[in-house]
Amino acid sequence: MKICMIGTGYVGLVSGTCFADLGNKVICVDKDKKKIIKLKNSISPIYEPGLDDLIRNNFRAKRLNFTNDLEKAIKESQIIFICVGTPTKKGGSSADLSQIFQVAKEISLSINKFKIIV
């Protein structure tokens, strides 16, 4: 499978790396260019035991890649996971879904054929 993980925080990075370790081709997308450079050098922005080694091994095996090019990642993938932040709104009554809505809009502008979006 060709999988796109949008967001390289805890959920996106750990899940994407594990999908790659299972043999899938995974491209992780993030707007933060500095974070992408670090990830391409096997430097994880989060701590999870064994994650650095999994990133390094799967990146070298070309099963895991990192980019800022959301449009290209969407077009090259069969499955797209939206893994962006949903912080609590002021007052703590609900989640701020604005990042999800923004990514959904960007996906709609880039999608070129049927995709599974999670």
Each language-model region and where it sits:
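Structural/interface elements that position substrates and couple domains in central-metabolism enzymes
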Residues: 1-117
